[in-house]
């Protein structure tokens, strides 16, 4: 019979196994005292594998042979659905990263995030209904295993009746044995030549996504999303190219960065004519506050400069919380948003946040930090011909819907913070 504890009652002690009278030599059955894993804690075996491979760069798989690197939303939703979005004057889509709940004590958080996103799809007005989910990486943990996709991706999102695009995170690309091939399972689920039933989905019906590769462009009405792969390094900045570093050149080619520069050159005149907003998505955060500069950020800055176009918004995951920064670039405010709060676990060593304020007083000395929330949730991103908006919704009622939001004017680049609890645009 369950025993109810009052607020002042001591916490129950971990269960202790009853010792058997005797055991044959070499046999052990029960833990003397069971100590459950903390959120984010790895088993001993996982720690050994993690430490061995978490900093070993992997080659970036080339795009699928003959594939067009620019993916059209019409090829996925169909012309009629995209025409309806265009005629409505607005597109809405979901985005968040780091969803894969790999242990039982984390499943509920991912399920709650996925459930709230699925409920958004019940909206029938084309201008308000999310058209797709753009995943910011770390679909599964810890080592990109194919057998993790059912429990960490397909089942949690089984009620999400819309396309899901994704860029890989470091855990999607990590391996735990030299015989493994990096990103093999990710490509089998997101980069197939055509949509087919996903083997890893088991009896569930979702088909694979036919992205051209692990980096690509997605073109949709009012918005173009450039997605990059930032490799497997966990503790430290991501890497999209060799960065002219001799020790990287034998492993990581410059193909992705060269493609990015050419893609920015292609989009620059289109953006200048105000025909599309440009969003860049990369798993590792390239900017984490005033006075900081990492090599990934420097590499991207170089590409933006050479390509002649700076994105209107930069999205990333990796850090398991929600943060919004504004960086001064060429006289404008450029928003960098970290949203790695999709369900895996909240960063155990990050400072606590306060639902009553956007930025805790202890962090207010960084003028670039505009919002800091250590809570699970997801983003709704909206684009029109003249504006781009980001809305962060938390599954925690103390933060709630539209816990943070901004509207970007695509002509003046002005960034306006929205009112709490009210979705802009």
Predicted regions and their residues:
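The substrate-binding groove and active-site-proximal loops of carbohydrate-active enzymes
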Residues: 99-102, 137-146, 231, 243-253, ...
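Short acidic, glycine-rich surface-loop motifs adjacent to enzyme active sites
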Residues: 267-289
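Active-site neighborhood of phospho(di)ester-bond hydrolases with catalytic His/Asp-centered motifs
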Residues: 95-97, 131-138, 142, 164-170, ...
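Short, solvent-exposed loop/turn segments at secondary-structure junctions
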Residues: 99-101, 140, 171-173, 231-234, ...
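Extracytoplasmic/periplasmic, Sec-exported soluble proteins
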Residues: 105-109, 125, 248-255, 292, ...
């Amino acid at each position: 019979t369950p025993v109810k504890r009052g607020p002042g009652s001591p916490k129950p002690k971990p269960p202790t196994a009853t010792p058997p009278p005797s055991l044959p030599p070499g046999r052990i059955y029960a833990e003397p005292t069971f100590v459950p894993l903390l959120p984010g804690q790895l088993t001993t075996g996982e720690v050994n594998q993690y430490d061995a491979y978490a900093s070993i760069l992997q080659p970036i798989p080339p795009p699928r042979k003959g594939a067009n690197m620019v993916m059209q939303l019409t090829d996925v939703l169909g012309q009629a659905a995209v025409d309806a979005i265009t005629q409505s004057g607005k597109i809405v889509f979901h985005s968040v990263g780091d969803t894969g709940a790999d242990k039982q004590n984390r499943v509920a958080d991912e399920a709650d995030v996925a459930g709230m996103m699925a409920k958004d799809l019940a909206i029938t007005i084309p201008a308000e209904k999310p058209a797709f989910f753009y995943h910011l990486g770390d679909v599964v943990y810890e080592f990109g295993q194919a057998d993790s996709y059912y429990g960490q991706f397909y089942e949690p999102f089984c009620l999400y009746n819309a396309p899901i695009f994704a860029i890989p995170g470091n855990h999607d690309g990590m391996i735990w044995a030299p015989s493994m091939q990096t990103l093999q399972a990710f490509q089998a689920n997101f980069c197939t030549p055509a949509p087919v039933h996903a083997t890893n989905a088991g009896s569930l019906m979702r088909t694979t996504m036919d992205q051209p590769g692990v980096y690509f462009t997605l073109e949709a009405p009012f918005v173009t999303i450039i997605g990059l792969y930032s490799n497997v390094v966990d503790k430290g900045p991501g890497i999209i190219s060799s960065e002219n570093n001799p020790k990287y050149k034998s492993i990581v080619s410059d193909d992705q960065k060269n493609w990015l520069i050419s893609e920015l050159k292609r989009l620059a005149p289109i953006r200048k004519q105000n025909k599309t907003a440009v969003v860049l998505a990369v798993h590792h955060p390239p900017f984490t506050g005033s006075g900081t500069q990492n090599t990934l950020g420097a590499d991207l800055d170089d590409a933006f400069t050479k390509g002649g176009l700076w994105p209107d918004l930069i999205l990333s995951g990796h850090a398991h919380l929600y943060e919004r920064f504004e960086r001064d670039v060429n006289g404008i405010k450029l928003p960098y948003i970290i949203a790695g709060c999709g369900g895996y676990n909240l960063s155990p060593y990050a400072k606590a946040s306060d639902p009553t304020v956007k930025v805790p007083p202890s962090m207010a000395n960084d003028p670039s930090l505009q919002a800091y929330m250590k809570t699970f949730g997801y983003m709704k991103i909206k684009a029109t011909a003249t504006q781009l908006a980001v809305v962060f919704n938390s599954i925690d009622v103390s933060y709630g819907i539209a816990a943070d939001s901004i509207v970007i004017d695509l002509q003046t680049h002005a960034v306006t913070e929205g009112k709490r609890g009210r979705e802009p645009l």
